[in-house]
Amino acid sequence: MWRLLLALLLVSSVCCESELFRDDLRTPETMAYINGLMQRRHQMQQEAQQHIQAIPPAVPLQSPGLVNGLGNQNDPALNRISGTSVKPSNLPAAYSNGYVDLATSDRIANSVLNFANILGQHLANGKTQIYSPLSIVHSLALLLLGAKGRSYEELSTVFDIPDTSRLHEQFGLMLQDLQQPTREAISAGRPLTDWRASSAMRSNRRAQRPGAHEVHLANGLFTQTGYTLNPDYRRVIVEVYASDLQIQDFEGSPATARYNINAYVAQHTKNHIENIIASDIPQTTRMILANALYFKAFWETDFIESATRPDNFYPNGEGTEPVMRVQMMATGGAYPYHEDHELGCKIIGLPYRGNLSTMYIIQPFKSSVRELMALQKRLTADKIESMISRMYRRAALVAFPKMHLTESVNLKTVMQRMGLGGIFSAVQNDLSLIATNEATRTNALGGNSLQNLEAQRRAGTGGARSDLVVDDIVHKVDFTVNEQGTEAAASSVTYLKKSGPDVLFRGDTPFMVLVRHDPTKLVLFYGLINEPPAAA
């Protein structure tokens, strides 16, 4: 039986440049910091009265590298298969004008967030967990593209979007927009999140710093020598999903193939993940799909480096035993915030520079490991989006644990529990649209490759059922939240508590974290922080 291994690699370096404060400092600089905070509080109260703006109408795409929504013959992404150019197909009429379909985009984003929430419930063990739902769902989309029969039916439940051609087109466009370094480079027609719309000028003041916001997504599809892909499948994963295709000799030189794949991953995660494939590759392997996501961003409002100090964290609720000692960071400023008394939780956003992404932190009012797990079961993508839509900036003081989290998990078992077990079964699996006995033919149906794949799926013209079976889905994450930068003076957490901000948010009890790309609403990282790393 031929094997297909999905290796998903994520690295997130969430950084912030810093100003400094300590508990025992009450200098003139501290007082100046407090006065500035209170002035910003008044400013944010005024902004809150006009934070909802009209959503701009959809306009034609201006994104480079896409012509008619699918591809430009000069696009480097089309020259990744042994130097051979793949000509773009013509899109269906519905896409020929190149518009962002916000309805479909929002459904895709909701699907990613719902998947994250369901996966989190299946992984729940009372410990800290962190993963990238976007990376996992992205790989499932590539499997959906080549699936038929029961495999297609199971994978379709992740998205619940009947028009799969539109799904892939819009998802590919969202992933392209996700990687743009500035708001201006993103496809026109994606509105600002409401709370960002009220304060875009402020959040853009420091957005032009080079490297302030970096997202890089890479797909490497490594196939056995002589194993030929369906030309329609190959064309779509290159043109729509910008995948890199490489040929490896898993049978004759598995050690070399392993080295090359690990090197590819290390390159695209800037050496944060260097050994994704730790063991020998089985010689029966015919394909390995490696998905690497690299994210690095600086906070819009700097954390205060010298304020970082050991502090208590209470997994079972504030004031209870056991008590963990963690490195707690602190800062103050104007942050988007909302309290939902029906759900019994609060949400605060820590924006990154560039007006693009935000770390949203959701915490029960009286949080504990048990309360957070109960909240997770109550939450849905729609409820989370509703809370985000009702946020507005308020003067706040924030204490948040410094974290470096690593996670490695094989997802086969949990996927089977989620009802996605067919792709792992030699009997039930059908990925015959990826590669078939007829795959050497050249686009025999002609026209658009997405439409061709859909026609093959419906009519059964994709050839004999494939022996390709997913062996496992390996998911690795390296996630860092820290502070770094220049030294300056500010005040202490204790003293600032007395200055009367609107909000005091302390991450000293369990919380949920979402790193979200606001223009596309895609969740890059999702986690439950029940036990942050202990203070050194």
UniProtKB/Swiss-Prot annotation:
Q: Give the subcellular location.
A: Secreted
| Swiss-Prot/TrEMBL site (Reactive bond) positions | S499, G500
Residues with glycosylation annotation = N355
Q: What are the record's GO terms for cellular component?
A: extracellular space
Superkingdom of this protein's organism: Eukaryota
Predominant subcellular localization, coarse grouping: secreted
Q: Which UniProt keywords apply?
A: Developmental protein, Glycoprotein, Immunity, Melanin biosynthesis, Protease inhibitor, Secreted, Serine protease inhibitor, Signal
The record's SMART domains line, in alphabetical order, gives: SERPIN
Secretion signal: which residues? 1-16
Q: What is this protein called?
A: Serine protease inhibitor 28Dc
Provide the species name. Drosophila melanogaster (Fruit fly)
* Recorded name of the encoding gene: Spn28Dc
